[in-house]
């Protein structure tokens, strides 16, 4: 597996456990790309859902993907602060087509005051049964929910106070 280069524009593909496409983001600019970490940014990019419907993101977002963790984090810059949407997912993979991951339904929404809510537990239970997630997936995801909430409390990684603003400034250099 290679990794995307700084300044490169890539698609992001989200899949379900059964291999079906879940969602595609048309264009994300890579701000940092290594074997273990990818940081990207997008603004008003086209998103295509599995049923073919499309929509456009409303605000700039910084995307954080790590090869060693079963989650990715999207920091969205809004007028009243940074909101985070965290997807419990497989670690990322990259090929010339796109940056890819498997979405495992559970999400954590983090508000500007760093309070958070675990979302979609019912969807996870349903898909776990339908797609027959192996028991090890449940163990891995529970461990990563704990890891992610620890990062939120500690303001670590993408939740660090200046993380999103710093990477957004870098993104603006590529837009001009």
From Swiss-Prot:
Superkingdom in the source lineage: Bacteria
Gene3D superfamilies, A to Z: FomD-like
For this protein, the Enzyme Commission number is 3.6.1.15, 3.6.1.6
Q: Does the keyword Disulfide bond apply?
A: no
Indicate which residues the UniProt annotation says bind Mg(2+) 1: 87, 103, 107
List the catalytic activities from the record. a ribonucleoside 5'-triphosphate + H2O = a ribonucleoside 5'-diphosphate + phosphate + H(+); a ribonucleoside 5'-diphosphate + H2O = a ribonucleoside 5'-phosphate + phosphate + H(+)
Tell me which UniProt keywords the record has, alphabetically: Hydrolase, Magnesium, Metal-binding
Xref: NCBIfam families: PRK13662.1 (NF010183)
What family does the entry list? Belongs to the Ntdp family.
This protein is called what?
Nucleoside triphosphate/diphosphate phosphatase
Organism whose genome encodes this protein: Bacillus cereus (strain ATCC 14579 / DSM 31 / CCUG 7414 / JCM 2152 / NBRC 15305 / NCIMB 9373 / NCTC 2599 / NRRL B-3711)
């Amino acid at each position: 597996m290679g990794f995307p280069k700084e300044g490169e524009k890539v698609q992001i593909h989200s899949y379900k456990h059964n291999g079906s496409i879940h969602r595609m983001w048309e264009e994300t600019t890579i701000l940092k790309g290594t074997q273990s970490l990818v940081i990207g940014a997008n603004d008003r990019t086209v998103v295509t859902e599995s049923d073919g419907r499309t929509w456009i993101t409303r605000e700039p977002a910084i995307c954080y993907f790590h090869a060693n963790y079963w989650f990715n984090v999207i920091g969205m810059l809004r007028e009243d602060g940074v909101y985070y949407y965290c997807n419990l997912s497989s670690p990322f993979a990259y090929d010339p087509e796109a940056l890819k991951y498997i979405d495992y339904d559970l999400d954590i929404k983090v508000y500007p005051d760093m309070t958070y809510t675990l979302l979609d537990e019912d969807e996870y239970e349903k898909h776990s049964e339908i797609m027959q997630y192996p028991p090890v997936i449940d163990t891995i995801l529970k461990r990563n929910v704990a890891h992610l909430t620890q990062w939120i409390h500690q303001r670590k990684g993408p939740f660090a106070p200046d993380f999103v603003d710093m990477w957004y400034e870098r993104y603006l250099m590529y837009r001009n």
